Amino acid sequence: MAKESTTIDVGEPSTVTKSSSHVVKDAKKKGFVAVASRGGAKRGLAIFDFLLRLAAIAVTIGAASVMYTAEETLPFFTQFLQFQAGYDDLPAFQYFVIAVAVVASYLVLSLPFSIVSIVRPHAVAPRLILLICDTLVVTLNTSAAAAAASITYLAHNGNQSTNWLPICQQFGDFCQNVSTAVVADSIAILFFIVLIIISAIALKRH
């Protein structure tokens, strides 16, 4: 009796599995590239944030120092009077010095959080803390600049309605110093606005 033989056909290896694995690998690769790209952008923002804080520290310390040393004594005096002008003669200027000194101290304390944002660009907590604190501190800084600016304006122009005479014609150096301090603090306010925008952009990318 002849033995029947059975033949089993083995088809060609399917390419479906291979193509699927390639798709998965490509997707993972693209995802990794996207994450790395976002991380690089956030790190760049964090570095710019750190440098801007250093600049703001220099500006605020300079503004507080110039206002603190603003003082002038006129070369003439009477038997009972000596004509002198100083920052401590006006409460608005005293408030300016104290407030801007607080702002400068905060900026120094905020540097470690900025460094953490550079090392860990995807971390949300330090960036959120900086955003909240920057918003609060810029309010303090703006109030100090506004108070000092109003008194500086009166020193330059006076007020005819209240018979307040301008004093800057006599105390030129004093007015120059306080004006410089107000301008410097206004620049610091602009720095803070940029810092807040940077933090908002970094948080939006999460």
From Swiss-Prot:
Keywords: Acetylation, Cell membrane, Cell wall biogenesis/degradation, Glycoprotein, Membrane, Transmembrane, Transmembrane helix
Effect of inactivating the gene: Disorganised deposition of Casparian strips.
Function statement: Regulates membrane-cell wall junctions and localized cell wall deposition. Required for establishment of the Casparian strip membrane domain (CSD) and the subsequent formation of Casparian strips, a cell wall modification of the root endodermis that determines an apoplastic barrier between the intraorganismal apoplasm and the extraorganismal apoplasm and prevents lateral diffusion.
UniProt record similarity statement: Belongs to the Casparian strip membrane proteins (CASP) family.
Positions glycosylated per UniProt: 159, 177
Taxonomic placement: Eukaryota, Viridiplantae, Streptophyta, Embryophyta, Tracheophyta
Subunit structure: Homodimer and heterodimers with other CASP proteins. Interacts with CASP2, CASP3, CASP4 and CASP5.
Protein name: Casparian strip membrane protein 1
UniProt key word Protein biosynthesis: no
